[in-house]
Amino acid sequence: LETWLRTIDLCNDSQLTQDERGLWGITGGPTEGALKVLAAKAQLPAVEARLVAKIPFDSQYKYMSTLQHIDGEARVLITGAPDVIFAMCREQMSRHGAVPFEAQYWEEEMARFARQGLRMVAAACKPVSLDATTLNHEDLQEGLIFLGIAGMMDPPRPEAIDAIHACQTA
């Protein structure tokens, strides 16, 4: 769980902010912001983390990835659409370490989340050499270990609510 929480925290472009009155805010998108808040509320132990390289999120490939140095170890972290992340993973993390990826189980979980109307974000990681300084899409094609899925309520946008109301009263 800690590795999953650390991944959704560090492979994330949003930031938590606190103003002079002590009020919290989020910069960045609402999905990443929700993940950042979840990680913050978990009160993980502090680590020394340094971003080395990044592949920004793009709707064409549906993920973002970072190469991080975390407490003297190097890891590639990735978050994105579950179906895309599933296709990149051959293993999943368990209490006992990495085990074979159970695709059918996770596809059923994804379907269950979808039936509940949840927006889903999957996370995976892999250890790499501390000498690694670059990150490209090919680096993500093998060795990723699936960590889990976050399911979040995605309330309709105000314009969608207005459109539905207009249709109902037409």
Where are these regions (language model features)?
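Cytosolic catalytic regions of ATP/NTP-dependent phosphoryl-transfer enzymes
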Residues: 1-146, 152, 162-166, 170
